[in-house]
C-alpha cells in the first residue's frame, strides 16, 4: 500500500522514464521499488530507521537502500524526489542535500501532504533552485517541480547545527542540535525530573531514544567511566548525539535501533525519557514492547529508570513486566519509574 504522497508520485512517474532517481526522506512503503517500472535505477535514503527497515529487504541490483543524514557517496541523479518533512526546519537541509546529487539539467520533485506544510515550498526553496512549479494536486497532496539554476554550497553539518550550553543537575553541558531534532534549549520537565534523580550506575548502560544526547552527556558528565550506548530511529538525532558527545569530549556507541531489536546482550542500566508522550495506540504499543524487551535485557542487579507522562497508561504494563516497582519522584505532569533487577 502506497501512502498518499507516493500515489501522487506514481501519477507522474512518466517524467522519470529511464532516469537515475534518488528518493530522499521516503516513507514506510514500496514507492522506490515501484519506480523501477519506469526508472533506470533508484537509490533511497531514509532518515527514519523504521522506513529503512521496511524498504531494505526489497533492495536489488537497481534499488539501493540507505539510512542516515547523508549518502555514503557523491553519485549524481537525473531526478531527486524529496518527501517534505514533518519537521519543517529540516526541509532546507534536504534541498541542499538534493542539490549535491543532481546533474546540471536534473529535476527536483517535492511532494507532501497539504496539511504538512508543503504549501510553503515556494518560500523555502533556496535561491540556487528555480521557483517551484505546482505539477499536481491530488490525494490531499501537492507535487512541485524545480531545477538547479546556481551552484549550491557544500553541506557542512556545522551550518545546520544549533549549539548551546545547557545547565543540568550534573553540571553544564554543550548540546549540538541539528535541524529537525526537537529541542527547547532548556531542560524539559520530564528530563529534569529524570536527571535530578539519576541512580549511580556502572558497566554497560543504554540511553533509549537518545535525541540530541542531553541525557547521554549528563550521564557521562556525572559518571565518565560508563560504557554507554545511545539509540534512536532518527538519523538527524543520532548525528546530533554524536556531535554533542564530541563537543563535550565524551565517547559512546551511537547507532540506530528499532526498539531494542538492534541491541545485543544485556545492560547494567537502561535510562530513558522515551518519545511516547502522545498516547496514540501506535506509540502505546511501541512503549509496551520497549518495557517488555527491557525486562529481558537487564542484567542481574541492573537498574531500569524512565520518566513518562503521568496520564499515560504505562503503570500496569511496567508493573506486569517488572513486578516490584518504585516511583522515586513525580510532579504534576511526569512520573519517574524505577526498577532494580534481582
From Swiss-Prot:
Cell location: Cytoplasm
Region forming the signal peptide: none
MF-aspect GO terms: 16S rRNA (guanine(1207)-N(2))-methyltransferase activity; nucleic acid binding
Principal place of residence: cytoplasm
EC number: 2.1.1.172
Gene Ontology annotations for the cellular component aspect, listed alphabetically: cytoplasm
InterPro entries linked to this entry: DNA_methylase_N6_adenine_CS, Mtase_sm_N, rRNA_ssu_MeTfrase_C, RsmC/RlmG, SAM-dependent_MTases_sf, Small_mtfrase_dom
Keywords, in A-Z order: Cytoplasm, Methyltransferase, rRNA processing, S-adenosyl-L-methionine, Transferase
Residue runs in coiled coils: none
SUPFAM superfamilies: S-adenosyl-L-methionine-dependent methyltransferases
Pfam families reported for this sequence: MTS, MTS_N
Catalytic activity: guanosine(1207) in 16S rRNA + S-adenosyl-L-methionine = N(2)-methylguanosine(1207) in 16S rRNA + S-adenosyl-L-homocysteine + H(+)
Function description: Specifically methylates the guanine in position 1207 of 16S rRNA in the 30S particle.
Protein family: Belongs to the methyltransferase superfamily. RsmC family.
Subunit field text: Monomer.
Protein name as it appears in the record: Ribosomal RNA small subunit methyltransferase C
Amino acid at each position: 500500500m502506497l501512502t498518499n504522497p507516493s500515489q501522487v508520485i506514481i501519477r507522474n512517474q512518466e517524467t522519470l522514464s529511464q532516469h537515475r532517481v534518488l528518493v530522499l526522506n521516503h516513507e514506510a512503503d514500496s514507492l522506490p521499488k515501484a519506480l523501477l517500472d519506469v526508472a533506470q535505477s533508484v537509490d533511497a535514503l531514509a532518515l527514519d530507521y523504521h522506513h529503512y527497515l521496511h524498504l531494505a529487504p526489497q533492495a536489488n541490483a537497481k534499488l539501493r537502500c540507505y539510512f542516515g543524514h547523508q549518502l555514503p557517496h557523491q553519485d549524481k541523479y537525473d531526478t531527486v524526489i524529496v518527501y517534505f518533512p514533518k519537521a519543517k526546519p529540516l526541509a532546507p537541509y534536504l534541498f541542499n542535500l538534493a542539490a549535491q546529487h543532481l546533474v546540471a539539467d536534473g529535476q527536483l520533485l517535492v511532494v507532501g501532504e497539504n496539511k504538512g506544510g508543503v504549501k510553503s515550498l515556494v518560500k523555502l526553496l533556496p535561491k540556487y533552485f528555480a521557483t517551484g512549479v505546482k505539477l499536481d494536486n491530488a490525494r490531499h497532496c501537492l507535487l512541485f517541480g524545480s531545477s538547479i539554476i546556481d551552484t549550491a554550497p557544500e553541506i557542512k553539518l556545522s551550518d545546520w547545527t544549533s549549539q548551546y550550553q545547557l545547565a543540568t543537575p550534573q553540571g553544564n553541558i554543550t548540546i549540538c542540535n541539528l535541524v529537525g531534532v526537537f529541542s527547547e534549549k532548556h531542560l524539559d520537565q520530564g528530563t529534569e525530573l529524570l536527571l535530578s534523580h539519576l541512580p549511580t550506575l556502572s558497566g554497560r548502560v543504554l540511553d533509549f531514544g537518545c535525541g540530541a544526547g542531553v541525557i547521554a552527556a549528563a550521564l557521562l558528565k556525572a559518571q565518565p567511566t560508563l560504557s554507554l550506548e545511545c539509540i534512536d530511529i532518527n538519523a538527524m538525532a543520532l548525528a546530533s548525539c554524536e556531535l554533542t558527545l564530541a563537543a563535550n569530549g565524551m565517547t559512546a556507541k551511537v547507532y540506530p535501533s528499532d526498539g531494542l531489536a538492534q541491541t545485543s546482550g544485556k545492560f547494567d542500566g537502561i535510562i530513558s525519557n522515551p518519545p511516547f508522550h502522545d498516547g496514540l495506540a501506535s506509540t502505546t504499543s511501541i512503549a509496551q514492547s520497549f518495557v517488555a524487551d527491557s525486562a529481558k535485557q537487564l542484567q542481574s542487579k541492573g537498574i531500569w529508570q524512565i520518566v513518562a507522562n503521568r496520564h499515560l497508561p504505562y503503570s500496569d504494563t511496567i508493573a506486569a513486566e517488572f513486578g516490584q516497582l518504585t516511583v522515586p519522584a513525580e510532579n504534576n505532569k511526569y512520573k519517574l519509574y524505577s526498577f532494580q533487577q534481582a
